[in-house]
């Protein structure tokens, strides 16, 4: 049986050393972001059916350094609960949406997950904290190359990036325990359905 979930609303040790003051500031801002995500989950529970997100999902969200996934000029706003521009006419998703879609995916430590639409790489990094392997596809080459560099810098060795049209999936790595699509297609691409394991789960806006 295939479960396709439609959200009701609408990533080696790191080589980037930060001063202790900046680390403290980011930790405080990240904690505030997590509190806002939890509050928004309660506020939207009637629409999503999820008054709270799983502990593992929240722990992953609280660990990933979102400020590394946005341009320098946006770092000050990295832990605000809103999307931000990342260049190439693309955005990094609102943290609440990342948490919601990740929770809907119900990731397990042994899972192999396909992400369609790498973008900044932030969603893939969150998944990498939760599952065994993440395959992610990005059609915008500069974004894909930037994400590859970030994954290397941050030590996400369980993330593999491909440049191309994600709606065709990644047949060589299939089948997948779950698939997450970060942008809404006109219809659910059949190749993605075909590449899900029996009983697999797809989260798609």
Predicted feature locations:
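Class I SAM-dependent transferase core
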Residues: 18-114, 130, 145, 149-153, ...
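Bacterial N-terminal signal peptides
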Residues: 3-14
């Amino acid at each position: 049986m295939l479960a396709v979930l439609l959200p009701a609303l609408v990533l080696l040790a790191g080589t980037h050393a930060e001063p202790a003051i900046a680390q403290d500031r980011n930790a405080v801002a990240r904690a505030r972001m997590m509190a806002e995500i939890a509050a928004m989950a309660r506020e939207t529970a009637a629409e999503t059916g999820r008054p709270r997100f799983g502990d593992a999902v929240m722990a992953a969200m609280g660990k990933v350094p979102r400020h590394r996934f946005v341009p320098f000029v946006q770092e000050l706003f990295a832990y605000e609960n809103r999307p931000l521009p990342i260049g190439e006419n693309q955005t990094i998703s609102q943290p609440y949406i990342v948490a919601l879609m990740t929770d809907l995916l119900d990731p397990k430590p042994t899972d192999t997950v396909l992400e369609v639409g790498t973008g900044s790489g932030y969603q893939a990094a969150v998944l990498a904290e939760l599952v065994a392997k993440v395959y992610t596809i990005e059609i915008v080459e500069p974004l894909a190359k930037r994400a590859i560099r970030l994954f290397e810098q941050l030590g996400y060795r369980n993330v593999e990036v491909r440049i191309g049209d994600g709606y065709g999936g990644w047949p060589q790595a299939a089948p997948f325990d779950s698939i997450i699509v970060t942008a809404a297609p006109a219809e659910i691409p059949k190749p993605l359905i075909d590449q899900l394991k029996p009983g697999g789960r797809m989260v798609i806006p």
